[in-house]
């Protein structure tokens, strides 16, 4: 089944949102490291005004618009992401990081029960297909430094400043 997409202009550039008939499947930044914009994928169709996928995308657009307007701090959307069981554990943990705060990759690994899994947590974080909504931008280095982000470090910095997250940048 082809995915349906829509475009959303935001302060961090035009996002492309993708959905199946039941859930949001992706959020892509203009500078996404995950390949070409999804609108170039074979079989993907732009959202119309009705249908199950269009309804998911309308909800996602509205909630992201509210996030950028600072009137929403959490998201309530059905999500569908392909990944391993471990990646899903990491992505679920990311959703528990409160708006306006950050955590480190090491702290997230420890929270998941394996303090030695820092690198694996970082890899799973980087594979998150639904950034912002699954807030991978809230994960920073051990000393508070900004580290990799699919939308670019400038976008990560903007999102954290937008949320009022106080971070100490490492030397």
Predicted regions and their residues:
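Short Lys/Arg-enriched helix C-cap and helix-to-coil transition segments
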Residues: 132-139
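Terminal helix-turn-helix DNA-binding modules in bacterial transcription factors
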Residues: 126-131
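Active-site and channel-lining beta-strand-loop segments
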Residues: 15, 139-141
